[in-house]
């Protein structure tokens, strides 16, 4: 069975999670802090309920598969197929009413990411890829005040960017880059980029896959933050690794780029080489 064979099931997971999450968005939802005294790290009833719903559907449909989730941990991590879930990536944006959050659904086969989706139910967008191709499914723009009439699918491709001085750079927040040396490294790249933007969460990576952003730089990521995004970015022609060129699916310090030329320039600055 290939990753493509799971595509319809991933759509079901996205539909189920979206139905759970949307009633909570832009409501008076309570956010708990799970940081234990560190940087505010919210979790909500919507996060937990959506992951529960997805886990239930996976267990019913593929009982031998493993699951790694942000809210409820790991089951059968050594299974041939492992689902990697982040029900709301960007919970800070979610509780602030900003639509840059998304549901991340990743599938690993023998430890390698083979399919991923970022579903944004509020904007009704689904970015998905298998490492060879990546697409966006969204509702076609309506004319006037008429409601959108049908789904539209378009191929995602990263854009050419040969130099940092031409690049648009995204990070969720420099405040989340906790180590002084890492922050200094990030600022070296930001200092040479044409434009820097903050607050994108998972949406920044999909904007990169769609050709609107050239670089995304983050630290302290977990597998559930990045596994789903890897096949989307690679399928769109981009690169995503750790700062030292390693496997991004394990998390840590992450660099994503749409063009290898700007990737190499950014990575040299991140690791202290010019």
Regions from the language model: what does each represent?
Residues 157-274:
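An extended, acidic
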Residues 48, 52, 71, 87-90, ...:
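Generic detector of well-ordered alpha-helical packing
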Residues 21, 47, 58, 91, ...:
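Residue-level signal for inorganic ion chemistry
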Residues 1-88, 261, 268:
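N-terminal subdomain of lithium-sensitive/metallo-dependent phosphomonoesterases centered on the IMPase/IPPase/PAP
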Residues 1-8, 141-151, 274:
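Short, low-complexity, intrinsically disordered N-terminal peptides in bacterial proteins
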Residues 77-139, 143-149:
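DPxDG-like acidic metal-binding loop motif
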